[in-house]
From Swiss-Prot:
<protein>
    <recommendedName>
        <fullName>Uncharacterized protein YrbL</fullName>
    </recommendedName>
</protein>
<dbReference type="Pfam" id="PF10707">
    <property type="entry name" value="YrbL-PhoP_reg"/>
</dbReference>
<dbReference type="InterPro" id="IPR019647">
    <property type="entry name" value="PhoP_reg_network_YrbL"/>
</dbReference>
<dbReference type="InterPro" id="IPR011009">
    <property type="entry name" value="Kinase-like_dom_sf"/>
</dbReference>
<dbReference type="GO" id="GO:0005886">
    <property type="term" value="C:plasma membrane"/>
</dbReference>
Length: 210
């Protein structure tokens, strides 16, 4: 049995807490702690969608892989890839990335990240219940390359999951969610900033503000 009760979680959501896997630095363990408040329903929905993706998805760069369950002293643990930068530091959220924008180059990089994210979701027909900047990690795989990763709200909760099985329904849902996503304050404020170009020619942003 894996002991997690003495660990501080990496993050806490509405229904789940995420812990570092004590036996594998490349993975994390999520624990459902609000089972009676929709937590069980959420994990069942997510795992059902992951099973669907496991049969067809070839490019996993934009979402964490799921690796099954383990027993912990906090209950059943669900094991996923941990998203960390090439230098070992935790990847920051898109919200944090947007808040760090100080120069024209930063905004250009933010726009490029958003373009990458939208293309990945469309090309791979990834269905999400919602899109929120705080649930998207900016995975820095080198000094010059960042990949957006959706780490929560994957799948759909409708009785008949049309977007999961129909490309047309999937694209329509994605467009609706994208409009709401771009309008969220964390992104809207950053994208409307009137910024000056930076004087140096270094990379605009990394995982931590310079």
């Amino acid at each position: 049995m894996i002991r997690l009760s003495e660990q501080s979680p990496l993050g806490t959501g509405r229904h789940r807490k995420c812990y570092a896997h004590p036996e594998d630095a490349q993975r994390c363990i999520k624990i459902v702690y609000h089972r009676g408040d929709g937590g069980d329903k959420e994990i069942r929905r997510e795992l059902k969608y992951y099973a669907h993706l496991g049969r067809r998805l070839k490019d996993w760069s934009g979402i964490p892989r799921y690796h099954g369950t383990v027993e912990t002293d906090c209950g059943t643990g669900y094991v996923y890839d941990v998203i960390a930068d090439f230098d070992g530091k935790p990847s920051i959220t898109l919200t944090e990335f947007a808040e760090q924008c100080r120069y024209e180059e930063d905004i250009a990089q933010l726009r490029q990240l958003l373009k990458q994210l939208k293309r990945y979701l469309q090309d791979n027909r990834i269905v999400t219940m919602s899109l929120k900047p705080q649930n998207i990690l900016c995975h820095r795989i080198s000094e010059s390359e960042v990949i957006p990763v959706v780490c929560d709200n994957i799948g759909e909760s409708t009785l008949i999951p049309l977007a999961t099985w129909s490309k047309w329904c999937c694209l329509r849902k994605q467009e609706r969610l994208w409009k709401r996503f771009i309008a969220q304050p964390a992104l809207a404020i950053a994208l409307q900033k009137d910024l000056q170009p930076r004087e140096s020619k270094t990379l605009a942003l990394t995982s931590r503000e310079a």
